[in-house]
């Protein structure tokens, strides 16, 4: 649940 949404980081910062 982050403001910084990335294609890969989407799973990391769930």
Swiss-Prot record:
Record bears the keyword Secreted: yes
Modification(s) after translation: In response to low blood pressure, the enzyme renin/REN cleaves angiotensinogen to produce angiotensin-1. Angiotensin-1 is a substrate of ACE (angiotensin converting enzyme) that removes a dipeptide to yield the physiologically active peptide angiotensin-2. Angiotensin-1 and angiotensin-2 can be further processed to generate angiotensin-3, angiotensin-4. Angiotensin 1-9 is cleaved from angiotensin-1 by ACE2 and can be further processed by ACE to produce angiotensin 1-7, angiotensin 1-5 and angiotensin 1-4.
One GO cellular component term: extracellular region
S-S bridge residues: none
Domain of life according to the entry: Eukaryota
Chain segments annotated as coiled-coil in the UniProt record: none
UniProt KW keywords: Secreted, Vasoactive, Vasoconstrictor
Compartments, as annotated in UniProt: Secreted
GO process annotations (BP): positive regulation of epithelial to mesenchymal transition; vasoconstriction
Main location: secreted
Family: Belongs to the serpin family.
Function in brief: Essential component of the renin-angiotensin system (RAS), a potent regulator of blood pressure, body fluid and electrolyte homeostasis.
Protein name: Angiotensinogen
Gene name per UniProt: AGT
């Amino acid at each position: 649940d982050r403001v910084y949404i990335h294609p890969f980081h989407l799973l990391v910062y769930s």
